[in-house]
Amino acid sequence: MKRFLLIFILLLTSCSSSATNQGAPIDSLAPCSSIKTTGAAADGLMLECLDGDGELAVQAIEGPAVISVWASWCSNCEAQRPNFIRLHNEAGDKLQVIGIDVEEQKKSDGYEHALKRGMNFPQLYDPDGRTSNYFGPGVPITQFIDKNGVIAFQKIGPIFTYEEMQELVSEYLEIKI
């Protein structure tokens, strides 16, 4: 009887509604029009919106923000993906989380990947690797943009744990999540 009760409690708590979306498929991407911008840097690095909703200058993204440069073929990008989804879900209006999909065979590959993986934050698209001139080569790369729009920190390589993500946000953006 105790064993049954223990199994029942474990099953019940594992279905808790307090869990956040950690990658369940979604129907549509957050529109690029939801990205807050300063209105400046219109001549900067212009990238298409992955959802087809126009284009945006990366330098015009208003901070505080966390920008993830990723690709569907990148295993380290995939490993850190849940941390960005969770950050977006838990940060609310404290900061923006934005993805930049790079160097896909087709734009639709990145779009479908983002939908299937539940990437519920706005996504930009770089079809030809122009972001490497701004962010540096390779993926994953994460930029932490402070409230003044200054690059406070750039992490080259994966952020494997949510605790590390929280520490970086706290240290460089002075925001507790």
Question: Where are these predicted regions, by residue range?
Answer:
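Structural microenvironment flanking redox-active thiols in thiol-disulfide oxidoreductases
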Residues: 78-117, 127-133
